[in-house]
Amino acid sequence: MKTLFLATSIALLAAMPTAYARPDNVPDLLAAVTFGTGERINGSGRIIDERRPLSAFGAVHLTGPVDVELKASDRESVTVRTDDNIAPLIETRVTGGDRPALEIGVKAGASFRTSRAPVVVVEFRALSELVVRGSGDVRADRISADDFVLSLSGSGDAKIDSLQAHRFAAALAGSGDLVVRGGRAEEQAYRLSGSGDVDASRLEGRSVQVAIAGSGDASVNASETLEATIAGSGNVTYRGSPRITQRIRGSGSVHRAH
């Protein structure tokens, strides 16, 4: 059951269609954020907090050059923080029917330039899924769930201050990094394809699986078992005293943290 959940979760994340598919043209120029190729709107410099109504959700899907702050709460809410003339270009909506997800992105055809990336502050009651595509970064204060799955594709990073879960599965494709600063997830699985790294060395776990295809590195913490499969130059560093099963093709390695 454990292996089935972890494998199925990562496969579903990899196959998930992209909501808000947009050109991800976001060069970093003089600390400005530029998005899109059409007629461009320049940010006014007047930063506002725009609170928006929304219905309940259990997942967050982010696309584009928007940063997200996730905050555990006893309610659901969303606040858009950006220039007053850019806020109308940032879309937030709940979709999905039986599995509602908060979709965050940029309106089709929008093109803008701001001094800093728009920020969407999300309060949530419960969260079981986080999908990040593009250049947006996500920061979460704490997440508590039975099963939690996460997907990063592109250059966006995800940082979680504290995670409490029974099962946790994460898939990284691209250069985005994942950092989990603390907590516990009994069963963990990570799939890395690209150059993105995982630092979950402070996320305690009992059983951990890592699959790397590329140059990404993973730091994990396992007390009983560690299964590592590496194809390429990626490395797995571990804490704890797990029983290790490893399959390596390439220059990658598995070693204990110093």
Positions of PLM-derived features:
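An anionic oxygen-ligand recognition environment, strongly enriched in 2H phosphoesterase
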Residues: 158
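Short, surface-exposed interaction patches in beta-rich subdomains
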Residues: 162, 178-258
